[in-house]
C-alpha cells in the first residue's frame, strides 16, 4: 500500500495518556508506582541554590583584608536577615563605629582575608512538581521524575500561549464557525475553560481574564488580536512562559479557522468535566504542541486500550487518513485521503512533486502537494 510521512496533530475521543513529569534538577520523588494522584498532588521536590551576593566588608568598614576575621560577627554557615549586621568595627572606646549589613536574607557562605569580601547566599528556592493530570503513577525515574497514566480525551493544538492550567469546560459557542466575542463571556465563566468556534477576539480575551476564566480553546486567532491582548508581538518559536493569567489553545492555527467538527464534538460531549490544558508551543527541534487533556471514566479494561505517550507521533499517511490542508487555495479545509499517486506531478509553481488526492468534507476532490497537508489523527 502506498504510504507517506507528514507532520500531524492528535485528536482522540478516548485513549490512555502517559505524561512524564520531570524535575529540572535532581531531587526527591515523593510518590511510588501504583499511587493514585490528583492534578494538584506534588509528585517531586527539589531545591535550587540561592543567588550569591558579594559584600565588600573591608571597604565598608575601612579595614585591611587580613583583619576581616577579627571583625566578623557572623561566621560561615550562619543565617542572616536583610539589614542584619555581619561585621562591626569599633575604635576609641566605641566612639568610632562602623557596621556592615547583609543585603539579603540568606547564609554566610564564606569570607576572605585576601579580598576582604564576604559572600552571602540567598536561601534555597524550593521546586515542587505537581501531577498536572489525575491518574496513576506507572513509573518512577529515580531522583528525576515520574510517569503518570490516565484515561482521557486528548486534543493537540496548532498554537498556544500560557502554561499549565485547569478548569471546567464550558461551551461559549454553539457551532465550530462561531466567533467568540466579549459579550458571550459572563461572570459565571470564572474558573472555566471556555470553548469558542472559529476565532477569539482581543476583547474576548481581555473579558475572559477580567472574569477569571482559566483558559480558552478556539479554532484560530488573528495575529493583531494576540498582539493587542499581550501588549507585544510574540515570537511563535517557543511559547508557554507568558504571564497572562489565561491559557489559550488555538486548535487550527492563525486567522479565522473553523474548529474541526470532530474536535468541537469532543469538547461539547465533555462539557462540565475538568480539562488540563497547556499552551506551551515549540516549533523548533523537539516539537511541543499545546494540548487539552480531559480525564474521563475508564472503561472496564483500560489496559487493553492503545497508549498514547508524549513522544509518539507515527506520521503515517495512507488512503483513508484524515488530513487538513495547510496552504492556499484550500487552506484550513479537511478531508480523507483517497489516493497517494507515486508518480511525480507538475504543480502550479512549475515544480515537480509528489501529491495527495483528498476528498474534502464538502465532497470535492482536490490534488495538493503532500507537503501541504498535516495529519489529524483520529
Language-model features: locations:
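Well-ordered secondary-structure scaffolds
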Residues: 1-378
Amino acid at each position: 500500500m502506498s504510504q507517506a510521512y507528514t507532520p500531524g496533530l492528535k485528536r482522540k475521543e478516548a485513549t490512555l495518556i502517559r505524561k512524564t513529569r520531570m524535575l529540572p534538577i535532581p531531587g526527591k520523588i515523593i510518590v511510588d508506582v501504583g499511587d493514585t494522584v490528583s492534578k494538584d498532588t506534588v509528585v517531586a521536590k527539589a531545591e535550587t541554590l540561592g543567588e550569591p551576593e558579594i559584600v565588600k566588608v573591608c571597604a565598608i568598614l575601612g579595614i585591611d583584608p587580613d583583619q576581616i576575621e577579627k571583625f566578623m560577627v557572623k561566621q560561615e554557615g550562619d543565617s542572616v536577615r536583610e539589614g542584619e549586621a555581619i561585621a562591626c568595627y569599633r575604635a576609641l572606646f566605641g566612639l568610632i563605629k562602623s557596621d556592615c549589613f547583609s543585603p539579603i536574607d540568606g547564609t554566610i557562605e564564606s569570607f576572605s582575608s585576601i579580598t576582604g569580601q564576604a559572600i552571602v547566599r540567598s536561601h534555597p528556592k524550593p521546586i515542587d512538581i505537581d501531577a498536572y493530570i489525575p491518574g496513576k503513577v506507572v513509573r518512577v525515574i529515580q531522583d528525576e521524575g515520574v510517569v503518570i497514566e490516565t484515561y482521557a480525551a486528548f486534543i493537540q493544538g496548532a498554537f498556544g500561549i500560557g502554561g499549565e492550567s485547569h478548569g471546567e469546560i464550558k461551551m461559549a459557542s454553539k457551532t465550530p464557525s462561531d466567533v467568540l466575542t466579549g459579550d458571550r463571556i459572563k461572570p459565571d465563566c470564572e474558573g472555566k475553560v471556555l470553548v469558542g468556534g472559529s476565532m477569539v477576539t482581543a476583547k474576548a480575551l481581555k473579558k475572559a481574564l477580567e472574569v477569571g476564566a482559566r483558559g480558552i480553546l478556539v479554532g484560530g486567532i488573528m495575529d493583531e488580536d494576540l498582539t493587542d491582548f499581550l501588549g507585544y508581538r510574540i515570537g511563535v518559536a517557543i511559547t508557554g512562559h507568558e504571564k497572562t493569567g489565561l491559557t489559550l489553545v488555538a486548535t487550527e492555527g492563525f486567522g479565522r479557522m473553523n474548529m474541526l467538527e470532530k474536535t468541537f464534538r469532543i469538547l461539547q460531549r465533555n462539557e462540565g468535566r475538568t480539562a488540563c490544558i497547556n499552551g506551551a508551543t515549540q516549533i523548533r527541534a523537539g516539537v511541543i504542541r499545546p494540548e487539552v487533556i480531559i480525564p474521563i471514566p475508564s472503561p472496564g479494561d483500560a489496559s487493553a486500550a492503545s497508549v498514547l505517550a508524549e513522544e509518539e507521533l507515527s506520521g503515517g499517511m495512507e488512503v483513508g487518513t484524515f488530513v487538513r490542508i495547510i496552504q492556499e487555495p484550500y487552506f484550513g479545509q479537511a478531508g480523507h485521503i483517497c489516493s497517494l499517486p507515486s508518480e511525480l506531478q507538475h504543480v502550479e509553481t512549475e515544480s515537480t512533486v509528489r501529491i495527495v488526492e483528498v476528498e474534502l468534507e464538502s465532497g470535492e476532490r482536490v490534488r495538493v502537494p503532500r507537503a501541504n497537508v498535516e495529519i489529524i489523527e483520529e
